Amino acid sequence: MEELKGYLEKSRSKQQHFLYPLLFQEYIYVLAHDHGLNVNGSIFYEPAEISGYDKNFSSLLVKRLITRIYQQNYLINSVNDSNQNGFVGHNKNFYSQMISEGFAVIVEIPFSLRLVSSLEGKKEIPKSQNLRSIHSIFPFFEDKLSHLNCVSDILIPYPVHLEILVQILQCWIQDVPSLHLLRFFFHEYQNWNNLITPKKSNYYGFSKENPRLFLFLYNSYVVECESILVFLRKQSSYLRSTSSGTFLERAHFYEKIEQHLVVLCCNDFQKTLWLCKDPFMHYVRYQGKSILSSKGTHLLMKKWKSYFVNFWQCHFHFWSQPCRIHINQFSNFSFYFLGYLSSVPINPSAVKSQMLENFFLVDTVTKKFETIVPIIPMIGALSKAKFCNVSGNPISKPVWADLSDSDIIDRFGRTCRNLSHYYSGSSKKQSLYRIKYILRLSCARTLARKHKSTVRAFLQRLGSEFLEEFFTEEEKALSLILPRISYPLHKLYRERIWYLDIIRINDLVNHL
């Protein structure tokens, strides 16, 4: 790290922005090895039959790689003949993946420097660990969505041309060789047919070979797509992270806004700016899906739809289908977000009032943000994981049948607790109870299959200790508190609980 800081200080003093020479430094690949998104799947872990050494990480590979990079016209020759035993011929693009992992660390340097410089003038860096939680967005929904009228369900457009990704980074990185190297990676990954592909029609599936690089590229692309909302970030970015704020600082962005949007609205720039400053507009995104909600009219949402489609067309040079943006009223619309089926239903009620000797009924309407577990997609996810069949009937899991009894119970119990933890904010718990029932009975069937016994006999032998493994810590605490207080159990279990320690979506929920 000290060598890296020294190089960056030297480059800054000379007003240079060359990142390409860092590819010849061994510590870059060490950083990629230590801080990769998927360390166990890192390309630096070479099998013993390839390196000849019985160890996971081989520094010999890095030295061999740097030596080959130094060879004249090495990258060019490797592109012309990918079948040679060279850059892309060794172990199925082995060295190419090594360089791409190192390049993923290097390409993040300009953004890291920008983030550090933005924090230098601040005496105290605000602690926003709780805002990293996925659940932190739902209290925001509870406070805001119940007062809004319209919502636009948006799918971020894809696929994007690879050259556009290079042009996006060109605004940040002035090192031409690094951009050419990125084009080279695109050429190879495009041949592998696994660069960035649409998955389930709502978000991108990243390359398994280098998730860090392509996650970085995707985030850069998404920020560019959202650049139309730069005027709204002060009004609607309660949960904005610091890195996103530095991403949005673009010197030439206002020229793009003035060039494209003014033509679309056929009016002057000030009125366009007034529309963007709608104080009741809220924008939330997760993965490739975003939600734009407003208290305005349906006509206002149509204007925003036109802005999005035309801005993406002018800026990215491809046609974004208008059917990807659905405008609905909150009263009759439900949307999937972070594994929940969310809606804002209208609940009519009548209140009996009395004025002097006259009685009359007053009809009132209330709106409340509801979150429920989508049981049908969830059963489909459990079916893919072999916990039940497509009808939701629990089945045994033969893959775990060879484990010990304690390991089997622990795995099923951990899965059940994780899902209970994630879906603790559900408004209605019936679907969650059904998921718990499926996992408990699937565990019992797996144990009965292992011991060649029946499920009933096995449950009688284990008793209540078997069920305790499936209780969360909160449920165990409630079982101790409830006997001491007079509080309805059914009302307590209807309360929603949002946790501020969930930083990623549950694996089973991610299959929805």
UniProtKB/Swiss-Prot annotation:
Keyword line: Chloroplast, mRNA processing, Plastid, RNA-binding, tRNA processing
Question: Which InterPro entries does the record match to this protein?
Answer: Domain_X, Maturase_MatK, Maturase_MatK_N
Which GO BP terms, alphabetically?
mRNA processing; RNA splicing; tRNA processing
The parts of the chain that form a coiled coil are: none
Q: What is its main location?
A: plastid
Which positions make up the signal peptide? none
Q: This protein's superkingdom?
A: Eukaryota
Q: Which GO terms describe its cellular component?
A: chloroplast
Its subcellular locations are: Plastid, Chloroplast
UniProt GO MF annotations: RNA binding
Tell me the protein family, please: Belongs to the intron maturase 2 family. MatK subfamily.
What is this protein's function? Usually encoded in the trnK tRNA gene intron. Probably assists in splicing its own and other chloroplast group II introns.
Any idea what this protein is called? Maturase K
Its source organism is Amorphophallus abyssinicus
